[in-house]
Amino acid sequence: MSSYFVNSFSGRYPNGPDYQLLNYGSGSSLSGSYRDPAAMHTGSYGYNYNGMDLSVNRSSASSSHFGAVGESSRAFPAPAQEPRFRQAASSCSLSSPESLPCTNGDSHGAKPSASSPSDQATSASSSANFTEIDEASASSEPEEAASQLSSPSLARAQPEPMATSTAAPEGQTPQIFPWMRKLHISHDMTGPDGKRARTAYTRYQTLELEKEFHFNRYLTRRRRIEIAHALCLSERQIKIWFQNRRMKWKKDNKLKSMSLATAGSAFQP
């Protein structure tokens, strides 16, 4: 992981000391061990593979190094950060702690080689303090988000019982407006023997269907849909009506032909 980041970082910024780095001032303010782009690690800089600024704002109550980081990070605001992208102050990369090439003190800036043990102890305590702050803030953010998400849902859930109570009072049937009714007689009623009642069409619907049948005895699906919309009927009703009308027309023609045949044979000499 670190090798991929080092290669991409060195290719993006060929002159490391001459480039102005975000959250860390100019390149001259860094120590000599970090001026080489090949020696940079993901933990010491708040950058991901795609160049996003993932650094964490530090409080100014700590040492001057972390205070400068907090001020410069406020000067360059980063996008909305998610807790899963935050890195603890004591980690340098996503690998295991045993394989880390640097220590806790080196993750946020190189210390002088001749530092006293007291300085190392203070740096370790400060890094542990920042780690606890990060964990607390990361754990508090999901709780705040959950509370914000739950509060609007509760606010929306409260007016619902009021709306239902006003729409349908107790002991009363809901009011049915004229636009809720069907234009033709309902065919869902059942007769006394349990069979479906005969579909009753209005005079206007029957007249329009008869006119359409006069021009064409067989309908396409598109024309059937158009008639169903025009007459406020279902497509299935139009299909069944035309089937019944064709059977009636065939029966009438058969009877007419038979009567003509019998009449013709009667007049034969």
UniProtKB/Swiss-Prot annotation:
SUPFAM superfamilies: Homeodomain-like. InterPro entries: Antp_homeobox, HD, HD_metazoa, Homeobox_antennapedia, Homeobox_Antennapedia_CS, Homeobox_CS, Homeodomain-like_sf. Keywords: Developmental protein, DNA-binding, Homeobox, Nucleus, Transcription, Transcription regulation. One of its GO terms (biological process) is embryonic skeletal system morphogenesis. GO terms for molecular function: DNA-binding transcription activator activity, RNA polymerase II-specific; DNA-binding transcription factor activity, RNA polymerase II-specific; RNA polymerase II cis-regulatory region sequence-specific DNA binding; sequence-specific double-stranded DNA binding. One of its GO terms (cellular component) is nucleoplasm. Residues 163-173 have a biased composition (Polar residues). The gene is HOXB5. It comes from Homo sapiens. PANTHER family: HOMEOBOX PROTEIN HOX (PTHR45659), HOMEOBOX PROTEIN HOX-B5 (PTHR45659:SF2). PROSITE patterns: ANTENNAPEDIA, HOMEOBOX_1, HOMEOBOX_2. This is Homeobox protein Hox-B5. Belongs to the Antp homeobox family. Its main location: nucleus. A motif (Antp-type hexapeptide) lies at residues 176-181.
